[in-house]
Structure formats: C-alpha cells, structure tokens
C-alpha cells in the first residue's frame, strides 16, 4: 500500500489523532509562563487553528453525500472553514515570524514582505467569501458532493505565494535564529507546498491539511527546544554574573581589611607589617602541610 493509499484509508483516524495532539499542545502553550505573552498567544492560536482545521475537514468527509438539511449546512460550513483556516494558519506563522525577529537588532526591511503576506491573507479571505456566491473555488451537486471549480487553482496560488515570502525571510535572516527553529520554519513552508502540488492531482485525500498540522506540531516542539536553550543560556549568564559579583565582593572585603590593618599598625613602629608577616608564614605552613590553594 502506498503512502497516499494509507492516508486515504485511515485519514479520518489520523485527523482525530493529530487534532487531539494539537488540542493538548494548545492547553500546554496557554499555561506556559516561560514564553513571552505575544509568542504564547501566537503559538496557542496557531495550534487551536490546527485543531479546528482537522475537525472541520473531518466533518466535511463524514457528511459528504448526505443530502439532509444537517448534511447540507455541515458540508458547506466545514469546507468554507477548511479553506479559511488554511489561510489563517499562514497568517499566524507570519505573526510568529514578526515576533521572532522583533528585538533582534536588524533592519525592518523584512517587515515589508511579511506585511505583503498579510495583504495576501486578506485578499485570499475576500476571494473565499466571494466564491461562496459565485462558485469560483468549488460547488456542490444535488447529492451534496463537493466538486472543484476551474478557479480552484487560485486558492492554491495565494498560500503558495505567502509560503515563498516567508521562506525568503527565513533564509535571508537565518543567522538570527537557532538552527532548530530555522529547520522547523523551512519544513513548515516546504512540506505543505509539496503536499499541495500532490493534492492537485489526487482527490479525496487531505494531504495538505494533514501536512500543515504535522508541521505545526514540529514547529511547537522546536519552539520548546529553542525556549529551553534560551533558559539555559540565561541561567549560565546569571551564574557568571553571580560569580563575578562574589569575586568583587571578596576583593573589596580583602582591600577593606587590609586598609584597616595597615591603619592600626601604622600607629606603632614595632607592629608595622606584623599582620602581613603572620599571614605569609601561615600560608607557608599550610602549604607544607599539604593544604589546597583554596584553603591557603
């Protein structure tokens, strides 16, 4: 059995499984305090959109061919939401990129491309709404079965353009991000593109949607890896600063004690330098006794 055949046979179960994983990740992300509020919000919405995408896609398949009133509305609402959520996920990835590059000290030229991604998102949403009344993207027959329209390729071109713009930003400014994040962002853009190309020639299999959600899961995992690296770096920096502060405090204490001893000994010619000689002899005795440098 081919991969496409396997997905076609078990895609409803795969959708349910992946949506459950994304639902758990949504709750975990919302509860995570280590992430910045803006990044936590973007990731949580991204994962929630992935859950809804698979659930609506699943409903579209379950009620396909159901000519009842319920089937009529479920199929139409589900297909509309599948198309919209595909665009919305790319919109959230754009916001995620903006958040990642904010505060990196780079020029704002990349924002022009990401803003254009947002314009494409709005344009795609408007065309999707228009298609509901004109049949630009798809239509339904009397048996409530979905059929692609000649203009269906447009709904593939817009996400494709957004993905290429996102890839160009990631490639150009990859040195500002960690390796796991760069890899996950590239996969998040490239894998759905490949799936979309296959989807053009294969009907009845949600390769694109399943691949998108799979990449969202990978994006989440790599975001956690990046977060752990940032926390570890911050911890090491804090330890270094603490050690330097302790060393400065110790040096200051030695200088203060030395100044006090010198001031006291300066009052009497006999005791002048006495404390220094005692300390020197004590160090020699300790070294001959085999004590460590730290002890001495």
Would you name each region that the model predicts?
Residues 1-24, 152:
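Hydrophobic transmembrane alpha-helical segments in integral membrane proteins
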Residues 5-9, 73-85, 144-156:
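Short aromatic-rich membrane-water interface segments that cap or initiate transmembrane helices
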Residues 13-96, 117-133, 185-200:
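Hydrophobic alpha-helical transmembrane segments of multi-pass membrane proteins
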Residues 23-29, 92-96, 156-176:
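Alpha-helical transmembrane segments in multipass membrane proteins, preferentially the mid-helix core
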Residues 29-44, 99-114, 170-181:
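Membrane-interface helix-boundary motifs at transmembrane edges
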Residues 92-95, 100-160:
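Membrane-proximal helix-loop-helix units in multi-pass membrane proteins
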Residues 169-241:
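Interfacial "cap-and-anchor" motif at the non-cytosolic start of specific transmembrane alpha-helices
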Residues 237-296:
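Acidic/His-rich, divalent-metal-binding segments that scaffold phosphate/diphosphate chemistry
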């Amino acid at each position: 059995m081919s991969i496409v055949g396997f997905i076609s046979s078990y895609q409803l179960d795969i959708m349910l499984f992946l949506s459950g994983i994304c639902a758990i990740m949504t709750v975990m992300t919302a509860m995570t305090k280590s992430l910045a509020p803006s990044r936590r919000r973007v990731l949580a919405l991204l994962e929630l959109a992935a859950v809804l995408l698979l659930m609506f896609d699943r409903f579209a398949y379950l009620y396909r061919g159901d000519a009842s009133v319920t089937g009529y509305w479920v199929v139409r609402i589900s297909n509309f939401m599948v198309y919209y959520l595909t665009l919305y996920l790319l919109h959230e990835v754009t916001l995620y990129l903006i958040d990642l590059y904010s505060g990196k000290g780079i020029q704002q030229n990349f924002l022009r491309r990401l803003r254009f991604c947002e314009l494409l998102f709005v344009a795609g949403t408007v065309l999707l709404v228009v298609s509901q009344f004109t049949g630009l993207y798809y239509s339904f027959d009397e048996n409530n079965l979905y059929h692609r329209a000649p203009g269906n390729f447009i709904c593939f071109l817009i996400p494709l353009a957004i993905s290429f713009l996102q890839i160009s930003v990631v490639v150009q400014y990859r040195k500002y991000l960690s390796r796991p994040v760069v890899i996950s962002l590239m996969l998040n853009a490239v894998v759905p593109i490949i799936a979309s190309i296959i989807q053009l020639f294969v009907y009845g299999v949600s390769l694109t949607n399943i691949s998108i959600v799979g990449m969202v899961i990978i994006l989440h995992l790599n975001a956690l890896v990046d977060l752990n690296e940032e926390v570890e770096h911050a911890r090491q920096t804090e330890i270094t600063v603490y050690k330097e502060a302790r060393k400065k405090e110790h040096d200051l204490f030695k200088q203060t004690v030395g100044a006090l001893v010198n001031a006291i000994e300066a009052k009497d010619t006999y005791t002048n330098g006495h404390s220094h000689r005692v300390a020197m002899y004590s160090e020699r005795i300790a070294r001959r006794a085999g004590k460590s440098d730290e002890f001495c």
